[in-house]
A protein has these predicted regions:
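Conserved ABC transporter NBD signature motif
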Residues: 58-72
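Q-loop/switch helix immediately C-terminal to the Walker
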Residues: 82, 89-103
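H-loop/switch region of ABC-family ATPase nucleotide-binding domains
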Residues: 181-183
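A short, flexible loop at the N-terminus of ABC-type nucleotide-binding domains that lies
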Residues: 1-5, 9-21, 28
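Conserved ABC ATPase signature
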Residues: 121-125, 129
Length: 204
């Protein structure tokens, strides 16, 4: 499976693009690491690639099909830097998880998710506990590409290592493509098969 971005441009103000003519082509076995300065639209780009935001111009294609026209579960899933922004605070975790694709028990175990957490509301979980849920939700059975936007910030160092060990094993077994956005060069050295510094009009 191939994920492509063709001529992606986007801006929040009319006539001003923070992303301009962005190009990407990657296969599902690749792990792409992205480093970029603040203000270069990293999170916005992630949201476009995951189908949350439509670009001003250009297309995101999954095996040639327009991602933004797909219905149902999106095969490109995003894990947000701030997990509280990706959940409904009025729903219990069991209801939030039920909105997505089926999650296998081994994923819950691999991420160290306690079953009684399902009965809690997002505000009753720590940032790290909520982030684990969001990672599990993104690893539904139909996921083909995973976008991780600074996902380690809510986790302590030991938990970071455990989570990344599990994630790398899971995506290798399932042949899931991975895009990692981070400020940590050592993390990318460990994880990525390709690394890029995001600059204006870069082609990946």
């Amino acid at each position: 499976m191939i994920l492509e971005a063709k001529g992606i441009s986007f801006g929040y103000k009319k006539g001003i693009n923070i992303i301009d003519n962005f190009q990407l082509a990657m296969q599902s076995h690749e792990r792409l690491g992205v480093i970029a300065p603040s203000g270069f639209g990293k999170t916005t780009l992630c949201q476009i690639l995951a189908g949350y935001i439509k670009p001003r111009t250009g297309q995101v294609l999954l095996d040639g099909a327009d991602l933004h026209k797909m219905k149902g579960y999106c095969p490109v899933q995003m894990i947000w830097q701030h997990p509280e922004k990706s959940v409904n605070p009025r729903l219990r975790m069991q209801d939030i998880v039920a909105e997505g694709d089926e999650i296998q028990e081994r994923i819950l175990d691999g991420l160290g998710i306690e079953r009684d957490w399902f009965k809690r509301f997002p505000g009753e979980l720590s940032g790290g506990e909520l982030q684990r849920f969001c990672i599990a939700r993104a690893l539904g059975k139909q996921t083909k590409f995973l976008i991780a936007d600074e996902i380690s910030t809510m986790l302590d160092l030991i938990t970071q290592s455990q989570i990344w060990n599990f994630l790398l094993q899971e995506i290798a077994v399932r042949n899931i493509g991975l895009i990692v956005v981070t400020h940590s060069a050592p993390l990318l050295e460990r994880i990525a098969t390709r690394q890029v510094l995001l600059e204006r009009q870069d082609n990946f």
